[in-house]
Amino acid sequence: MYGDREISSSYVREELRKGNMEAVNDMLGYAYTVRGKVEYGQQLGRKLGFPTLNVHPAKDKLLPPNGVYLDSVKIDGIWYNGIGNVGFKPTVSSDKRMLIESNLFDYSGNAYEKDVEIQLYHFKRPEQKFESVETMKAQIDQDIAYAKEFFRYHHKK
């Protein structure tokens, strides 16, 4: 049981579609995971001071709503905490392929072409189109501060 409902795959999918990652992870007994290969991107995050790794998930992978999530990424067997965006990057891209991009707090290596696992822990906010790159950067700075505080108490890898 989870709350007052029987745990079932349909209940897990229902909560995933809402972005309720805490409930999803509790019901599964492990963190919801997306696997993929790191691809080259526009490198705009790097230019703005928060490099991201980019993964296009499988087309049939059920994903939570577009938005910003606190996550961890496994690269070469090591987990790194970060903050990621699930969606389309509407401020800086017109690409309509679903993308998960993640800024990792303690990783400085080269992950291009590597297979990674991304675990989603907590929905922070919906994806949005910002008026400017500067406005987006200010919001991302706030998101990163929030995520670092979260990881001080939760999901240390």
What residues fall within each predicted segment?
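Phosphate/ribose-recognition catalytic cores of enzymes acting on nucleotide-derived substrates
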Residues: 2, 40-157
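Classical nucleotidyltransferase
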Residues: 1-51, 131-135
